[in-house]
UniProtKB/Swiss-Prot annotation:
Disulfide bonds: C24-C49, C298-C362
Subcellular location: Secreted, Extracellular space; Cytoplasm; Cytoplasm, Perinuclear region; Endoplasmic reticulum
Gene label: Chi3l1
Keyword Acetylation tagged: no
Protein name listed in UniProt: Chitinase-3-like protein 1
Residues annotated as glycosylated: N28, N36, N58
Function description: Carbohydrate-binding lectin with a preference for chitin. Has no chitinase activity. May play a role in tissue remodeling and in the capacity of cells to respond to and cope with changes in their environment. Plays a role in T-helper cell type 2 (Th2) inflammatory response and IL-13-induced inflammation, regulating allergen sensitization, inflammatory cell apoptosis, dendritic cell accumulation and M2 macrophage differentiation. Facilitates invasion of pathogenic enteric bacteria into colonic mucosa and lymphoid organs.
Keyword Manganese listed: no
Pfam families: Glyco_hydro_18 (PF00704)
Binding positions (chitin): E68, W69, G95, G96, W97, S98, Y139, M202, T203, Y204, D205, W350
Signal peptide positions on this chain: 1-19
Length: 381
């Protein structure tokens, strides 16, 4: 007799038998994608992740604030998931690409504006039912390094002071670059790690059009052709470097992308290192040159040639003059095996709305196939 466990029971097993986190980012602009690309928080599986991070909040008049007209409604949708899974933690992420580094810089470099921000956070999170804050400053520079550390220390102190009997202390996490140059210039890793509950390491976006050649944006290991600074552009180096800088293994959460990076080939040459003319064509739903959601990649794979970069343990696919490097169930399982060997805190997914959340694109009628593959791999003894 075999025991078939429903998804929720598997999650309970995952959460009780191991301390692995599965941290899933949800983006509030995914609601605006057309047709089957549109994703609202009520489409998320309450039993899939241990933590869901809602991206992104804004800062107005130096105070934490909403960024979309209907954020409050979406906050409610997301936090309703906790009625079905009381162990689920939700965090609100502030910052992101469009927020910009300069605005963060101005706010945190001034003690008065920083204090206003810090004191605004807990009431906002409590009002809307969140369990914590995630800082997505992309990215602090050399002049911001000490201010970023101070911000984190002050937020942690405020959360400690704010907690009431019968309530849990608010969580504090940060999304941190895995790029060596950015890490060196903007982060005092050993210091911030002391005060953060966990660190979401962005081990992706390592390769882009600036290289003028094809290459995978989230390879597990260094490639044969990677010399000079390119040798730093892989998951293994990013994780190892963070650990050497003082990040404790039990706070480091390794990022796994549910998106691919695409390029337009310059010639018939289509292997790793082939010349390119620029970004790949935009996806039907995400509409951003050079980036495809996993569900768009599943469409792309029909009629495409699929290859595996064996040493780097990731796939890429070509069709016509289009080249896309991405992750699939096999590669994410290898990444989970790697992070478990390193005794890391768990995996982070950017983003659940880029996975096949409807289960209608990638076959087998499986919802969130990549995130589920990660969850299953984390649960394996």
């Amino acid at each position: 007799m075999t025991l078939q466990l429903p998804g929720f029971a598997v999650l309970m097993l995952l959460q009780s038998c191991s301390a692995y986190k599965l941290v899933c980012y949800y983006t509030n602009w995914s609601q605006y994608r057309e047709g089957n690309g549109s994703c609202f928080p009520d489409a998320l599986d309450h039993s899939l992740c241990t933590h869901i991070i809602y991206s992104f909040a804004n800062i107005s008049n130096n105070k934490l604030s909403t960024s979309e007209w209907n954020d409050v409604t979406l906050y409610g949708m997301l936090n309703t998931l906790k009625t079905r899974n009381p162990r689920l933690k939700t965090l609100l992420s502030v910052g992101g690409w469009s927020f910009g580094s300069e605005r963060f810089s101005r706010i945190v470099s001034n003690a008065k504006s920083r204090k206003t921000f810090v004191q605004s956070v807990a009431p906002f999170l409590r009002t809307y039912g969140f369990d914590g804050l995630d800082l997505a400053w992309l990215y602090p520079g050399p002049k911001d390094k000490q201010h970023f550390t101070t911000l984190i220390k002050e937020l942690k102190a405020e959360f400690t002071k704010e907690v009431q009997p019968g309530t849990e202390k608010l969580l504090l996490s940060a999304a941190v670059s895995a790029g060596k140059v950015t890490l060196d210039s903007g982060y005092d890793v050993a210091q911030i790690a002391q005060h953060l509950d966990f660190i979401n390491l962005m081990t992706y976006d390592f390769h882009g059009t600036w290289r003028h050649t094809t290459g995978h944006h989230s390879p597990l290991f260094r490639g044969q052709q990677d010399t000079g600074p390119d040798r730093f552009s892989n998951v293994d180096y990013g994780v190892g470097y963070m650990l050497r800088l003082g990040a404790p293994t039990n706070k480091l959460v390794m990022g796994i992308p549910t998106f691919g990076k695409s390029f337009t080939l310059a010639s018939s040459e289509n292997q790793v290192g082939a010349p390119i003319t620029g970004s790949g064509l935009p996806g039907r739903y995400t509409k951003e040159k050079g980036t495809l959601a996993y569900y768009e990649i599943c469409d792309f794979l029909r009629g495409a040639e699929v290859h595996r970069i064996l040493g780097q343990q990731v796939p890429f696919a070509t069709k016509g003059n289009q080249w896309v490097g991405y992750d699939d169930p096999e590669s994410v399982k290898n990444k989970v095996k790697y992070l478990k060997n390193k005794q890391l805190a768990g995996a982070m997914v950017w983003a659940v709305d880029l996975d096949d959340f409807r289960g209608s694109f990638c076959g087998h009628n499986v919802h969130f196939p990549l995130t589920n593959a990660i969850k299953e791999a984390l649960a394996v003894a």
